[in-house]
């Protein structure tokens, strides 16, 4: 059986770092991952995927990857369940990240955040071209 996940997305907020009673670091975070197709309005939608990472990798992620950071992770899908205070059974599906990698420098991330995620910083104030996927040769 194979349970491998590879995701590339942006952190929706800073990771929440906590420690277990046995002093093991664990961080939870969410990645916004763009879908490969556009909706009926012509816009790309994103999936927001809950993730968890453990030990030294958790501390590293919490220290270095902040909201908006482009991150690549490898890991596996995990399902678990628990009973909440109202006695209801709650089911959770999340990605357990085993490794992560920052995919852009801190400087480029800060520039992206400061420019309001503008994509025209390299090309001046050029107008955006409207190219549909049907026009592409591949």
From Swiss-Prot:
Region (Disordered): 105-138
Gene Ontology annotations for the cellular component aspect, listed alphabetically: nucleoid
Biased amino acid composition, Low complexity: 105-121
InterPro entries found in the cross-reference section: NA-bd_OB-fold, Primosome_PriB/ssb, ssDNA-bd
Listed PROSITE patterns: SSB
Keywords of the record: DNA damage, DNA recombination, DNA repair, DNA replication, DNA-binding
Any Pfam family hit: SSB
Renumbered ranges of motif Important for interaction with partner proteins: 133-138
GO molecular function annotation: single-stranded DNA binding
Endpoints of the signal sequence: none
Gene Ontology process terms (BP): DNA recombination; DNA repair; DNA replication
Domain SSB positions: 1-104
Domain of life: Bacteria
SUPFAM superfamilies reported for this sequence: Nucleic acid-binding proteins (SSF50249)
NCBIfam families: ssb
Subunit structure: Homotetramer.
Role according to the record: Plays an important role in DNA replication, recombination and repair. Binds to ssDNA and to an array of partner proteins to recruit them to their sites of action during DNA metabolism.
Name of the protein in question: Single-stranded DNA-binding protein 3
Species this chain originates from: Streptococcus agalactiae serotype V (strain ATCC BAA-611 / 2603 V/R)
């Amino acid at each position: 059986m194979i349970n491998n996940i590879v995701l590339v997305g942006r952190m929706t907020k800073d990771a929440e770092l906590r420690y277990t009673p046995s002093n093991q670091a664990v961080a939870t975070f969410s990645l916004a991952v763009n879908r490969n197709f556009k909706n009926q309005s012509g816009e790309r939608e994103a999936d927001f995927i809950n993730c968890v990472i453990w030990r030294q990798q958790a501390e590293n992620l919490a220290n270095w990857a902040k909201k908006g950071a482009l991150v690549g992770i490898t890991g596996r899908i995990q399902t678990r369940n628990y009973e909440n205070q109202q006695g209801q059974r709650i089911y959770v599906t999340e990605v357990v990240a085993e490794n992560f990698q920052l995919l852009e420098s801190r400087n480029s991330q800060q520039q992206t955040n400061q420019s309001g995620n503008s994509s025209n910083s390299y090309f001046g104030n050029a107008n955006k071209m409207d190219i549909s996927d049907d026009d592409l040769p591949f």
